[in-house]
Amino acid sequence: MEIFTLALALLLPWMGGYLLLAGVEGRCGLRAGTLRQLGLGFFLGYAALYGIVALYDAATNSLAFWPILSLAALCCIPGALLFLKRDTPGWVMSAGGGADSSPLLRVLFWLCAAWTLLHLLLVAIEILWRPTFPWDAWTSWLYRAKAWFYAGALIPLDEPAAWLEGAPTALYNAPGASYPGFTSVLALWSALALGQWNDSLVNFPVLLAGIAMVMAFYGQGREADLPPWLAMLGSYLLVSTPLLSTHLSLGGMADIWIMGFVGFGLVEIIAGSVRGERYKIVLGACLVIFALAVKNEGVVWLAAAALLCGVMRWPRIAGAAVLAGCVVIGIAALSGIHSVELPGLGQIGVVGDRLHVPLLGEMGLARLELWDDYLANFMQGDSWHLLWPLLALALLALAFSRPSAPRRALVALLCVLLATQLAIFQFTEHGQWAEEWTAINRVPLHVLPALLFALILVAHRLCARARPGEAESGKMHWSLAPLAGLAVTIAGLLLYLDGSQPGVDREPLNLHGGDLRLIAGSGEQHGDGVRVTDFQNGIAVLSSGALVLDSSRLSVLELRLRSERESQRRMRFFWRTTSDPQRVSAIEFPSRDYVRSKLGESVGWHGTVIELGLILFGEAGETVDVDSLILAPSSLGGSLRTLWHDWTFHESWGQTSTNFLFVGASDAAVHLPLIVAVWLAVSVLFVWMLRRRLASPVALVIALGVAGWLLLDVRWTTSRLQQASDTVAFYGQGDRAYLDVPTGEKYLLQRVQTSKGLMRDPGDTVLVLSENGDSDFLIWRALYHYLPTPGFAHTG
């Protein structure tokens, strides 16, 4: 019964949104497709659901599932009547596309379709098994939803600062308490349908959002007269983008919803501008406006959408308006006018060192150098696959092509994105969110659908304008350019790795785990290694004992160990030298089964080493097997082995996964996306050099870009399959409310449940703090577990 009511609660608003959109477009005789209407109808229906829940609470000061569901059903009636009376039926295939004629393109279509379904299946596994995972979700968005569920109303919450100052006005407090409630209400709605708070199923709307996005993107592509293979390729590129896939899988974040409204709103604006369909521009503007109900940053995207619309529809007027605005600001600054009061909106301008923006509040001015952070995330990290290199190639190709609507769309969209990034990060104190990589990827994620849609429009335009035919005499095989690019890339990689080797010839120092002596904690021999079975105050220390070692000759550490999934939070390698025997130097590593580190780059690794060892962290009942500790001279072969291991290493979900991603080891010497991007760039250069001797150079460049993306996605999908297996294995063992991250939350949850039983009044407020002041994660998790008991998290 619970699953039935959940399905009814989630599908009814979706169908209501679809019926309304399809009915309006059908009654107006507009050319529209069923898949696009289903996809966009989902977001329209859920926007209406949010309004219904908020209005019901405002009228009754309570929440009741069946009355709200009945109101939602009544709101579906006008859309259903319009749908039944529409003049034109919906359709799926566009008149201009038809089926793909080439067998190769049909294979590509079904490959992308199958891979898209696989990505959605992996998302479903995470949603169904994993409890709410991201930090922002359970400290803010879903903390508020959970509090509302137990309170039975959309009660106000305080910011933690109000409680810290001793002036609370609400029963609960949470960071971002003043943010719009859309994300929280959707999780609350799922809980109301279930009749209980289920930390996994409350995120089920996020899975439906992913399905709706795929439908909307494919449908919009077909309406734009893209061939089926290209529309499906775009849908696959969307759902296979690692950062989007991660947000879908982990749930609880507002970024998915603001991407649904802003991203597809901009898609509608672009599609309407390119094809001259004004109703799509209006619909796109409405979607962007709905983003105001998700996050305050929707104001920025609304301004960006207005600018994009102006550039697309009236480029000269928009350019003149921007220029006039700059002139007015310049004159005001020269005249000493730095801020003005806008009636009903508040102050806009600069007062002292603070920037005031209507609806967004005030923020400090600052100037940060963020280009290295953008390079690390957009070119080296795994959050985007090859999105940014492909966009750069598209811009380069458009520079040599004739003006067109797709070209104007891509250039305008990237300029708008650049302007928003500069406005948010480059010149204000919010730049620290980019510098710390907290939001540097999440903000561009909001416009990902529009970026990909503009990209495939450009690809289609370039293919249509290309003139395939017989090349000049001496035609070359298409494989020459990518093979030459591969050879150059490999040669460059080998030269880079070889240049970092000192060339010292020395036998390595090979210590088995059994050669290390436990001086804190206890364990037992396990083959040639040692198994740590007990941790003393949470740590175990293994020492080599006294030795004499020339650090300059053995500068590479290789460590192999095995541990349980919940074990080994982190580890440290330590050493002492003759120059300062009392000082212990150490470097810390994340949890993994194999570590290779260049000690020569570490502070303190110099002179003669007289002792070395390991510090392992764990808890009661956990074990760690230390197999070997090797100190070796640096070599090209060793670097290549380490690089391969780093590229194929599986990095489990972490609390930063919704901010940035590294599919392999985050400390790899060279990251695979950068290598693939270099190969793509060099291959494209060879294609350009040989363009007169190749039959279809444009098609070849597009094929190379797709091949590079598929290569990276093979690794990403493999990692996702491993992650799904780990998730099912961990959370399938009973009702586990604690997260599979190495923090000791399992024992925290037991203490929370015990203390709840000792409380005289469940309505009492709890104060959660830590003795050592460095356990912010556990403090906030305790606050979440204490619900419905109100509490305050004292951190620091």
What are these regions (language model features)?
Residues 123, 130, 303-304, 311-401, ...:
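Membrane-lumen/periplasm interface segments of specific transmembrane helices
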Residues 234, 268-269, 280-296, 302-307:
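Membrane-interface alpha helices of multi-pass inner-membrane proteins
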